[in-house]
Structures are given as structure tokens and as C-alpha cells.
From Swiss-Prot:
It catalyses: (S)-2,3,4,5-tetrahydrodipicolinate + succinyl-CoA + H2O = (S)-2-succinylamino-6-oxoheptanedioate + CoA. Belongs to the transferase hexapeptide repeat family. It is found in: Cytoplasm. The keyword Repeat applies. Substrate binds at R104, D141. Pathway: Amino-acid biosynthesis; L-lysine biosynthesis via DAP pathway; LL-2,6-diaminopimelate from (S)-tetrahydrodipicolinate (succinylase route): step 1/3. The lineage of its organism: Bacteria, Pseudomonadati, Pseudomonadota, Gammaproteobacteria, Alteromonadales. One of its GO terms (cellular component) is cytoplasm. Gene3D superfamilies: Hexapeptide repeat proteins, Tetrahydrodipicolinate-N-succinyltransferase, N-terminal domain. HAMAP family: DapD (MF_00811). One of its GO terms (biological process) is diaminopimelate biosynthetic process. This is 2,3,4,5-tetrahydropyridine-2,6-dicarboxylate N-succinyltransferase. Keywords: Acyltransferase, Amino-acid biosynthesis, Cytoplasm, Diaminopimelate biosynthesis, Lysine biosynthesis, Repeat, Transferase. The gene is dapD. The keyword Transferase applies.
């Protein structure tokens, strides 16, 4: 794997000279192998090691190289046609393979080749971009978007219209991560490499980027780029220093553990915020 990484790194440095017609066959094969391994979940752009998320930048480079290497081609979408560089993940699936992988894909859901979809997932009409990792037991609801290289944990619910930001450039930026057992409410947007830690509940219409203040009303602490584990978060505002105006913030109204989540429904957690 180290040799493959080094070859991808070298090709990326020479990317300005790479086109579909000039690319060396070995580089094309290396990039295609990485895309295939991402597609199967054998590799992932980010993984948690000893409690910390680590980003494998060389895999992001391979994904970016794929846009230099592969030319546009007609893609058959049953009811229509597409013209793009990236094929669709399920283009060659048959009934046996869908059953073997235990995934349910509702018509018009779109998943690009190079993204991983775990067992027992449900994809409503939604969009999953390449490099993304969607772990088992997750629901991607209608019109939700999982951006490039985003990492979605086990048993996550992405509600209708949710946007999970992608990140290929700038290259050093970390992917947006939703950890296990999280609920993201309808029309919320989590972007710019924000990490929503395990067991958190995000209410409807909450927008969180790296510059968003995430205010814990119990402690007064302000977080940036990270929603602590077990947080229940709603949209709100914080006053300016001069007291003349307020600015948007995400407010942690309470903390819950797995035991509480098991006893109390998501709607009840969000309803009682006082």
C-alpha cells in the first residue's frame, strides 16, 4: 500500500501534464484501483484511530486525479442519460448483489462510483458523491446530499434535505464527519470538515461550518468545528459584544447518553428544550 501511495503522490505532483489522452497506463490503473477500493470500503479517506480522526490525503489526491484521467462518457440512468467522468456505483448491480449487500435504493437516488454504502442502509431519492463512506444501518432521506469524501457513521439518520459538505479542495481540509448513532434534522447543513460526535441530535434547520459558534448553554463554553458527543443542538443566536445586534449560533441545549436516547424518542428530545 505504501508503494501505491507514493505512486499516487508522484502522479498528483505532475497532474498539470495529465489528460485522458496522455496519462500513463500504470497511473490510470493505480487511480482506478484506489477508486475500486474506496467503492468497496477497503480504503476510506478518513478513519478513527485511537479516538482521533486521521485523514489520508493521498486518497483525496487519487480522487482528484480521476477527474484528470477519465473522460466524459454517456451514463445510462434508465429514465434518462447522463454525461460525466464518474460512473454510477450501481450501474452493474443485479438483484443478487443488492440482496447480498443488503441495501435498499429508491428510484432516483444517485451514488457515484468510489463511494461506499454499508449493509442495511436505505437510500431515498438522494445523492452520494465519490469518496464518501456511508456505514451500515444508515438512512439517507429524500433530497439529502452526502458530499465528496464525507464520512457517515453507523445507524445515522440524515433527514430530508440535509446537506453534508464535501471536501476535495483545499486538499488539506478534513472531510465532514457524522459519527455513529447521530440524527441530523431536516434541511440542516453540516459542512467544512465539521465533526458531529457520536450520539448527537441536530434539530431541523441548523447550519454548522467551521466559523459557526456552537454554544453550550449549560457550561457557557463555545466550540468551533466540533459538536461534542451526545449533544442536542438547535439553531439560535448569541448577542454581540456591544449588545446592539445578535449573530447566528448553534446552541447545545442539553446532553444525552445512550440510555436516555433508548428511552426517549428523538422528537421528545428536541421538543423539551427549556
Amino acid at each position: 500500500m505504501e508503494a501505491l501511495r507514493q505512486r499516487i503522490e508522484a502522479a498528483f505532483e505532475a497532474r498539470a501534464d495529465i489528460t485522458p489522452s496522455t496519462v500513463d497506463a500504470s497511473v490510470r490503473n493505480d487511480v482506478q484501483n484506489v477508486i475500486n477500493m474506496l467503492d468497496k470500503g477497503e480504503l476510506r479517506v478518513a478513519e478513527k484511530i485511537d479516538g482521533q480522526w486521521h485523514v489520508h490525503q493521498w486518497l483525496k489526491k487519487a480522487v482528484l486525479l480521476s477527474f484528470r484521467i477519465f473522460d466524459n462518457a454517456v451514463i445510462d440512468g434508465a429514465e434518462t442519460k447522463y454525461f460525466d467522468k464518474v460512473p454510477l456505483k450501481f450501474a452493474e448491480y443485479d438483484e443478487a448483489r443488492f440482496k447480498a449487500e443488503a441495501i435498499r435504493v429508491v428510484p432516483s437516488a444517485t451514488v457515484r462510483k468510489g463511494s461506499f454504502i454499508g449493509k442495511n442502509t436505505v437510500l431515498m431519492p438522494s445523492y452520494v458523491n465519490l469518496g464518501a463512506y456511508v456505514d451500515e444501518g444508515t438512512m439517507v432521506d429524500t433530497w439529502a446530499t452526502v458530499g465528496s469524501c464525507a464520512q457517515i457513521g453507523k445507524n445515522v439518520h440524515l433527514s430530508g434535505g440535509v446537506g453534508i459538505g464535501g471536501v476535495l479542495e483545499p486538499l488539506q481540509a478534513g472531510p465532514t464527519i457524522i459519527e455513529d448513532n447521530c440524527f441530523i434534522g431536516a434541511r440542516s447543513e453540516i459542512v467544512e470538515g465539521v465533526v458531529v460526535e457520536e450520539g448527537s441530535v441536530i434539530s431541523m434547520g441548523v447550519y454548522i461550518g467551521q466559523s459557526t459558534r456552537i454554544y453550550d448553554r449549560e457550561t457557557g463554553e463555545i466550540h468551533y468545528g466540533r459538536v461534542p458527543a451526545g449533544s442536542v443542538v438547535v439553531s439560535g443566536n448569541l448577542p454581540s459584544a456591544c449588545g446592539k445586534y445578535s449573530l447566528y449560533a448553534a446552541i447545545i441545549v442539553k446532553k444525552v447518553d445512550a440510555k436516555t436516547r433508548g428511552k426517549v424518542g428523538i422528537n421528545e428530545l428536541l421538543r423539551i428544550v427549556d
